[in-house]
Amino acid sequence: MGPPPSLYTHAVGPRSRLISAVAAAAIVLVALAAPARATEYFVAPGGVGNGSGSFPFGRIQDALDAARPGDVITAAPGTYAESLSSVRGGSPDAPITLRAAVARTAIVTRASRILTVSHAYLVVDGLVLDGQYAPDDTVRVTSSGNFLVLRNTEVRRSSRDLIDMAAPVGVLIEGSLLHHALNAAGGRTDAHGIVAGAVRDLTIRDTEIHTFSGDGVQVDPDRAAPGWDRVTIEGSKIWLAPLPGPENGFAAGAVPGENAVDTKAAPTNTRSRITVRDTVASGFRGGFINNMAAFNFKEYVDATVDGVTVFDSEIAFRLRGPATGALVLLRNAVVYNVTTAFRYEDNIQNLRLWNSTVGLNVSRAFQAASAPKATLDVRNLLSIPALSAEASSASNLRANASSFVDASAHDYHLVAASPAVDGGERLDDVTIDRDGLARPQGSGYDVGAYERAPTTARGQAPATGPAGTR
């Protein structure tokens, strides 16, 4: 069962669907490889038994105390007023799995931390973890909580962070809903959706994060050695909106958060790498801070941003130097309904903005801040706002609404008569568009985030696979 519908919907792109399908197949293989002697423990509210199907435990923690590698804990629908801690780890081919019998119906809640993971190879699937706005993280993952899988799980209501990780390796957060990390102390205090230290190989996939007073995702506030690396965010949604009513000290109408993604990394560490693809961010405006941005890439990071959409925000991408600042490759982006699409600062170097579309209701495509010596490489940019000096390359084009299928509905696919069709230059690092269609489809690269597919005799674009195969 997938995540429940929310007020904010987004269709996962073909690349994310392919990645998710591969991941699902791997999960099946792991399940088949589980030891034949694995035990399934059952838990139900009010149970007083030994964990059997007919005589279940009453507490999930009792099952965690008993579980060994390969075992499965199944929690019946209901409310469990307890805090949970891992007791022992699983193994690569035999994780310990804690799952809800019916997704999102087993609710673990109390005014405290709800889950502490300090052992490797634990899978948490389909639970609701509710911290009741306690002054603690809802989920804490220590540096020993390697290869945690948090799948199809709702994590909510913290006055600190919803998920706080030290420096584990290989954590996967997938198909989950994280919301309401709010701390109104001092007017507004950081409470993040996900915050991580020197993590490695963290993946956040097909996950929705909203309503926080810090950042949706932040790495690493402590800038700890040896530094974080290989963080991936894909197929996800990160958003803010004015609060519909008073909430944990904030007034109705407040927009308490800062950024969808915020990076911090010490120049004495190895440069930290982050990839964000097929992800949507919105609502980053009208808050408590100046220069409110969806994506705030700064310090010693190497960021690849592909197929990202930003709207209803003050700044879509805030990109910050200097030479020891962010290295950024941004391609296949679509930006609309923002004040500034790209703000570049502090003499950022080697900023590459390729094959992206700046749509309607954007006050300015570029804004420089303390950046007289910044170096930008802007190519194949398609922009409804006027092109500025940053986009002086001949491959960049100004467009009007008639170049697109339906600009008023923010559908920025190209029509056949658009001057952007075959009007760009070849970029070897941009091999597909944001739909997964191979570039080029015609005699040359199209300008902007979308490649226009050739039409069949009936005037319909042919079906394409995730990499543009037919």
Region locations from a protein language model:
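Bacterial N-terminal signal peptides
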Residues: 22-31
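Detector for repetitive beta-architecture
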Residues: 40, 70-72, 77, 95, ...
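Acidic Gly/Asp/Thr-rich repetitive segments characteristic of extracellular carbohydrate-active
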Residues: 43-82, 418, 446
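Right-handed parallel beta-helix/beta-spiral solenoid domain characteristic of secreted/periplasmic
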Residues: 72-77, 89-138, 182, 399-402
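Feature marks extracellular polysaccharide-active and adherence modules
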Residues: 76, 87, 99-101, 118, ...
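Predominantly extracellular beta-rich ligand-binding scaffolds that present long acidic/polar faces
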Residues: 83, 87-89, 93, 278-281, ...
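Extracellular beta-strand/beta-solenoid scaffold signature
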Residues: 85, 93, 109-115, 133-142, ...
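Surface beta-loop-beta hairpin patches that serve as ligand-binding interfaces in beta-rich domains
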Residues: 418-470
